[in-house]
Amino acid sequence: YTSAEMSCFMIGDIDVDAIEAQIKKMFSDIPAQPNAAKREYYPVNDNKEPIVLVYQDKEQSNVQALIFNKHEATPDEQKGDMGYLVQNYATTLINNMLNARLNELVQTANPPYIYAATYDDDFFVAKTKDAFTGVVVCKEDAIENGIATLLRETERARQFGFTETEYNRARAEYLRQLESAYNERDKRKNEEYVDEYVRHFLDNEPIPGIENEYAI
């Protein structure tokens, strides 16, 4: 950790000039380290055969399985255009529609799992590879059926997509949440701003602001 790799965020009802001066006073004298280690981003190789890891924890009463499908991460320099926001919108709705299907199966008389969901994000802590990830939680004697159901529903969505009704429902919910965030924009908590700025600093995630997102 060096000063060149750090940032400081101050959020709140503050005197900007006074706080900025105080931050400069506290941190400007920290010297740069001429021999600091270079920050490296290592590639994550693809694999043809599945890599399986099993970990046992006696305190866990249920079994959890995570299935990662790796894919290339969006380069930081491509995250500043409208195409990236459109990509995020599509990814969000795809996962929301698939998760709605998975949740419906929990409501059946004989559910295949206790919980199941999908999301798309970093592959563990890697910055050079993302992963479409499926999570399923089952009783110990139902793990095979739980994993099979998760994979089957994911493949069904990949091959045949979703219905217009599913899309309209997911889109309406997405817009409802966006409108709610816009209407409550003056009540946002400080940590919500901090989270946005941290993601921008570390991963170059855009910060369009709720006003612009709502307008788009």
Regions inferred by a protein language model and the residue ranges of each:
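An aromatic/glycine/proline-enriched structural segment found at the starts
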Residues: 7-62, 172, 176-183
